Amino acid sequence: MSKVLILKSSILGDYSQSGQLVEHLKQHWEQQGAEISVRDLAAEPLPMLDGEIASGLRGGDQLSARQEQALLLSDSLIQELKAHDTIVIAAPMYNFSIPTQLKNWIDLVARAGVSFTYTETGPKGLITGKRAVLITTRGGVHKGGASDHVVPYLKTVLGFIGIEEVETVYSEALNMGPEASKQGIESAQQALEKIVA
């Protein structure tokens, strides 16, 4: 049975377009018997990386209570990642980048010696044998252009920790009028259905 981890990062709650697409994908996977876990990074935000937490994530025997909590949380998030076959990341474009809530997750998951390591030939990801599906929503049209920092960044991060099989579903032009928005959602839904098929 396939195990799927869904990461939601929109701050818009029930009004989230990326959330609607995630739900569409989730329903299709559930019909196939997939085991699905959902982590809503906006509804249950993770701590933002600062100097104290960054130092604590390196470990040690003289950690503050806050550092110990962050280290345990990071370990838990990485184990959660390892326990699933497919990782779905819903990443709306906010000001040409990803939501802060998703960046917080990345900062807790990307850990030297745990999710990646440095070798003589360069960095090597340690979370392998997974695939990722990126669902990215945006008000305008940015796919493949210089203004799209979302997909290249996420692919780089995922590859860095070992997840190199990445499929991307774009839902664009969502703020460019009702017809364009409808088409942007429907084309993304069709692309998601092909992934599940």
Curated annotation (Swiss-Prot):
Catalytic activity line of the entry: 2 a quinone + NADH + H(+) = 2 a 1,4-benzosemiquinone + NAD(+); N,N-dimethyl-1,4-phenylenediamine + anthranilate + 2 NAD(+) = 2-(4-dimethylaminophenyl)diazenylbenzoate + 2 NADH + 2 H(+)
UniProt cross-references to InterPro entries, sorted A to Z: Flavodoxin_fold, Flavoprotein-like_sf, FMN-dep_NADH:Q_OxRdtase_AzoR1, NADH:quinone_OxRdtase_FMN_depd
Pfam families for the chain: Flavodoxin_2
Cofactor note (record): Binds 1 FMN per subunit.
Cofactor section: FMN
EC identifiers of the protein: 1.6.5.-, 1.7.1.17
Keyword annotations: Flavoprotein, FMN, NAD, Oxidoreductase
GO molecular function ontology, one term from the record: oxidoreductase activity, acting on NAD(P)H as acceptor
Oligomer status and interactors: Homodimer.
Annotated HAMAP family: Azoreductase_type1
Function, in words: Quinone reductase that provides resistance to thiol-specific stress caused by electrophilic quinones.
Protein family membership: Belongs to the azoreductase type 1 family.
Name this polypeptide is given: FMN-dependent NADH:quinone oxidoreductase
Organism of origin: Shewanella sediminis (strain HAW-EB3)
